[in-house]
A protein has these predicted regions:
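Extended hydrophobic alpha-helices typical of membrane-associated regions
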Residues: 4, 9, 230, 236-308
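Alpha-helical membrane-protein architecture signal
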Residues: 4-8, 25, 51, 130-133, ...
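Intramembrane alpha-helical segments
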Residues: 8-14, 62, 84-175, 179, ...
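The first (N-terminal) embedded transmembrane alpha-helix
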Residues: 16-35, 153, 157, 293-298
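Multi-pass membrane catalytic core of lipid/isoprenoid biosynthesis enzymes
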Residues: 21, 50-57, 73-128, 205-258
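Membrane-embedded alpha-helical segments that form the functional core of polytopic membrane enzymes
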Residues: 26-71, 81, 105-113, 122-137, ...
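Helix-loop junctions at the membrane-solvent interface of multi-pass transporters
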Residues: 33, 114-118, 140-141, 165-166, ...
Length: 308
C-alpha cells in the first residue's frame, strides 16, 4: 500500500497536476455559459454537473499526460531537460503507468456515463471514446508532423466543447463555445511552439517534428505571435457572440468583465513573447498562461452570474 501511494505521488508530481489550470478554467466557463446558449436555454448548472465535469477533466488530463510520458520515455531519456522524469529515471515502471492510464480511461467513461441517469444526457458517454482517442493522438503526432502543437491545442480545446455538451447539448448549435474552443486551440498551440524552443537540437537529433525544429528560433517566434493574434481575434468573437459576455457589468463603464479580461490577456501575451525572446520559459509557459486561463474564466463566470 505504501509503495502504491509512493508511486502515485511520483506520477502526480511528474505530470504536474497544478497545470490542469490550462484547461479546467475553460471547461468551467463553458459550463456556466452553456445553459444560456442555444435555442432552448436551460435553467442553470447543477452542482453535480460541475463535480462530474471536474472529475472528467482530472481523468482526461491524467490519461493524456501519462500516455505521452509512456510513449515518449525513450526520447525523454535522451533529453537532459526531461531525463529526470519518473519513467526514464526508473522511479516507476511502464506497467505502473499503463495501470493508471487504464484506470483514468475507465474513470472518464464512468463519469461521462453518469450524466445519463442523473441528467438524462447520454451525449458525454457517446463522446468519451472519441475524446480518449484525440487525447492519445498528441503523443504520437510529433513523430509525423510539426503541427503537433495544434493537436495538443485541440486536445485542450475539447474542454469547453465537452463541458457544453455535458450541461446543455443545444449550446453547441451556436458559435460561442466553438469560438472559445478555437481560442484555446490557438492559444495552446502558440505557447507550445514557444515551449518547444528549448528542445530544438534534441528534436532535430531524434527526428521529432516541431515548428521550431523545422523553422528555427526566429521564424518560430514569429509564427507563435501570428497564432496568438488569431487567438485574440477569436476571443473578441467569443465576447461579441455571447450576450452574457458583452453586456456591460463594470460600474461606470461600457465594459463587461470579460472584455476587460480580453484586454488584460492581450497584455499578458505581449509579456509572454518578450519573456520568450529572453529565454525565460518558465515565466512564459507556466505563470503567464496560468494567469490567462484563470483571468478569462473568472471574468466570464462573473458576467454570467451577474446576468442571472
Amino acid at each position: 500500500m505504501i509503495s502504491l501511494f509512493r508511486k502515485g505521488s511520483v506520477l502526480a508530481g511528474d505530470i504536474k497536476l497544478a497545470h490542469s489550470i490550462f484547461a479546467l478554467p475553460f471547461a468551467l466557463l463553458a459550463a456556466f455559459l452553456a445553459p444560456g446558449i442555444g435555442t432552448a436555454p436551460a435553467p442553470g448548472i447543477a452542482p453535480g454537473q460541475l463535480l462530474l465535469i471536474v472529475l472528467c477533466m482530472f481523468f482526461a488530463r491524467t490519461y493524456a499526460m501519462l500516455t505521452n510520458r509512456l510513449l515518449d520515455r525513450s526520447f525523454d531519456a535522451a533529453n537532459p531537460r526531461t531525463a529526470g522524469r519518473a519513467l526514464p529515471a526508473g522511479r516507476v515502471k511502464p506497467r505502473d503507468v499503463i495501470f493508471v492510464i487504464l484506470l483514468c480511461a475507465i474513470g472518464l467513461i464512468a463519469c461521462a456515463a453518469a450524466f445519463g441517469p442523473l441528467y438524462q444526457n447520454y451525449y458525454p458517454l457517446l463522446a468519451s471514446p472519441l475524446v480518449l482517442l484525440w487525447l492519445g493522438a498528441y503523443a504520437v503526432a510529433k513523430r509525423f508532423t510539426p503541427l503537433a502543437h495544434f493537436i495538443l491545442g485541440g486536445a485542450l480545446g475539447l474542454s469547453p466543447l465537452a463541458a457544453g455538451l455535458a450541461v446543455q447539448p443545444a449550446s453547441l448549435a451556436s458559435p460561442p463555445l466553438w469560438l472559445l474552443a478555437g481560442f484555446v486551440l490557438l492559444w495552446v498551440g502558440g505557447f507550445d511552439i514557444i515551449y518547444a524552443l528549448q528542445d530544438i537540437e534534441h528534436d532535430q537529433r531524434e527526428g521529432l517534428h516541431s515548428i521550431p525544429a523545422r523553422l528555427g528560433r526566429g521564424k518560430s517566434l514569429l509564427t507563435a505571435k501570428f497564432v496568438h493574434l488569431l487567438a485574440l481575434l477569436l476571443l473578441v468573437l467569443v465576447m461579441r457572440t455571447s450576450p452574457a459576455l458583452r453586456t456591460p457589468h463594470i460600474p461606470g463603464t461600457d465594459m463587461s468583465w470579460f472584455s476587460l479580461g480580453v484586454v488584460l490577456v492581450a497584455a499578458l501575451l505581449l509579456i509572454e513573447h518578450r519573456a520568450a525572446q529572453r529565454n525565460r520559459f518558465t515565466l512564459a509557459f507556466f505563470t503567464l498562461n496560468g494567469l490567462i486561463a484563470l483571468l478569462l474564466a473568472a471574468a466570464g463566470v462573473a458576467d454570467v452570474l451577474l446576468m442571472m
